[in-house]
From Swiss-Prot:
Its EC number is 2.5.1.18. This is Putative glutathione S-transferase C460.02c. Residues 89-216 form the GST C-terminal domain. It is an enzyme of class 2 (transferase). It is found in: Cytoplasm. Pfam families: GST_C, GST_N. One of its GO terms (biological process) is cytoplasmic translational elongation.
């Protein structure tokens, strides 16, 4: 069934989980390439905060906030969930939501990803001290996750779930931009978790697995 249209771009941190979930649930969604710095006027009228991704259903239903969109997709397609991605009881549902909120609201936040992510993208000039200090703060936060996944293969239960699809895909920006070989050795459990979830979430359909030897900021 055609569900509607996602407005974002394919490699946006919060977009691949939506595309992959829709694919696994046999939901047809379109992706209209949309960027923060070129947010269409008509779309801004519907979503004045101009955050990505946003979704407009085939029936005109408008929805923002990635967790809300993600959960809406699952509810619309859960009859096609042949992998057991969803919760089997209220406890699992609460645990899945906990992990999604944690990565979305406590880790992938402006306080943790800026200014290093903006410098990496070239949207602000590179400044060595600011880049390294902000990247170090981000890595300190990732050390918390490293301990949380130390004895876990999956976040909820003993199978790949919605929580892993969401959480794993949200880690990409860190591994792509600021986690070099030395740092991966400091984050062995997180690295194992990310690589495992990268493959189980089939994220190679959206971007390659990038585990750089060194951090190199592109010349802008």
């Amino acid at each position: 069934m055609f569900l509607g249209t996602i407005y974002s771009f394919k490699t946006n941190t919060r977009t691949p989980c939506l595309l992959e979930l829709a694919k696994r649930l046999d939901l047809q969604v379109d992706l209209v390439e949309t960027y923060h710095h070129k947010f269409p006027t008509d779309l801004a009228a519907k979503f004045p905060l101009q955050k990505l991704p946003v979704f407009i259903g085939a029936d005109g239903f408008e929805l923002s906030e990635v967790i809300a969109i993600f959960k809406y997709f699952y509810e619309k397609g859960k009859h096609n969930d042949k992998e057991g991605l969803g919760p089997i009881n209220e406890i699992e549902e609460a645990e899945m939501l906990k992990w999604m909120c944690f990565i979305n609201f406590d880790i992938v936040t402006p306080q943790i990803v800026r200014p290093w992510v903006d410098m990496f993208r070239g949207s602000v000039p590179y400044e060595d001290k600011a880049f390294k200090e902000s990247a170090a703060r981000a890595i300190d936060s990732l050390k918390i996750i490293n301990e949380l996944v130390k004895d876990r293969t999956y976040l909820v239960g003993d199978r790949f779930t919605l929580a892993d699809l969401f959480f794993g895909s949200m880690l990409r920006r860190f591994f792509h931009s600021i986690i070099d070989e030395k740092t991966r050795k400091e984050l062995p459990h997180l690295t194992r978790y990310y690589v495992t979830m990268f493959h189980q979430a089939k994220l190679e359909a959206y971007y390659p697995l990038e585990l750089p030897l060194t951090v190199t900021v592109p010349n802008n």
